[in-house]
A protein has these predicted regions:
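Amphipathic alpha-helical dimerization/coiled-coil segments
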Residues: 84-131
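Regular, well-ordered alpha-helical segments
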Residues: 29, 54, 135-138, 170
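Acidic interhelical loop/turn segments
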Residues: 134-154
């Protein structure tokens, strides 16, 4: 990857910075709130904004923080143009990273009972993520300029959780215990 290339994660950072700007810690917090969308390593939420700023997609300024100065990033015209250009490209399904699907891949090697038990344990995680989505729905009200789009996203994520619940139910029915 060239140092000027924008990745899916780059666009995520530009989108999270949004209209009002954000520090790296804010970006990580926003990504973690829903948990399902925090797919990058923690350090990337600190290094990618710096990289984007060095290439002119973000502007960086220092502000007083709770314990020390913090860097706040805002979109530049180049960053807005990059988002506008990206928005015009066709949407593709990105590769899916799924622990549940990996368990099914190795089921013939490790056995159905252990795979079934592992998949059934997913219910607790589904409940946790679903609760986070409900909290995100409440937070969406505080962002009127994004509320409509956040609600579409959250509805999609609820659907993904529904699919996980269906997978767990099928595993319970079809795999031996």
């Amino acid at each position: 990857m060239s140092t000027d290339e924008l990745t899916l994660f780059s666009y995520e950072i530009l989108g999270l910075v949004g209209r009002d700007g954000a520090g790296a810690h804010d970006l990580l917090r926003m990504a973690r709130q829903g948990r399902v969308l925090a797919w990058a390593g923690e350090s990337q939420y600190y290094t990618e904004p710096k990289r984007l700023a060095s290439h002119g997609y973000l502007a960086a300024r220092t502000e007083p923080g709770k314990t020390r100065a913090r860097t706040v990033y805002t979109l530049t015209e180049r960053g807005r143009e990059a988002l506008a250009e990206y928005a015009r490209t066709p949407v593709r399904i990105t590769p899916i990273k799924s622990d549940a699907l990996l368990r099914l891949l190795i089921c013939d090697l490790v056995g159905e009972p252990v795979t079934r038990d592992a998949l059934v344990s997913l219910r607790e995680d589904i409940a946790d993520v679903r609760q986070r989505l409900v909290e995100s729905e409440r937070r969406a009200e505080a962002l009127p300029h994004r509320e409509k789009y956040l609600r579409l996203t959250l509805a999609h994520l609820h659907g993904l959780l529904d699919l996980h619940e269906q997978l767990v139910a099928r595993a319970e029915d079809e795999l031996t215990s």
